[in-house]
């Protein structure tokens, strides 16, 4: 009977150790996800700004070309 309580202690220690390892793994995964999110956010913002700037530049280029063509083909007075 005395050995049974010793086994319970060993199994309790084993379950505690496994539980601690599992909790550490979950904590590490959460930390990695937060780090990845924190890293991706500025890159995403930079890409959005680059796309917006490119679209605005292209729009200005088309407007300038349209104005130049319109001026060139307009009848002279």
From Swiss-Prot:
GO terms for cellular component: chlorosome envelope. The keyword DNA-binding does not apply. One of its GO terms (biological process) is photosynthesis. It comes from the Bacteria. Keywords: Bacteriochlorophyll, Chlorophyll, Chlorosome, Chromophore, Photosynthesis. The keyword Chloroplast does not apply. Its main location: other. Transmembrane segments: none annotated. It is found in: Chlorosome, Chlorosome envelope. GO terms for molecular function: bacteriochlorophyll binding. Belongs to the CsmB/CsmF family. This is Chlorosome envelope protein F.
């Amino acid at each position: 009977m005395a050995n049974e309580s010793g086994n319970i202690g060993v199994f309790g220690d084993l379950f505690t150790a496994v539980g601690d390892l599992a909790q550490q793994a979950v904590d590490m995964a959460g930390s990695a996800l937060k780090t990845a999110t924190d890293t991706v956010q500025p890159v995403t913002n930079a890409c959005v700004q680059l796309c917006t700037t490119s679209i605005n530049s292209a729009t200005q280029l088309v407007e300038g070309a349209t104005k130049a063509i319109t001026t060139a083909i307009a009848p002279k007075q």
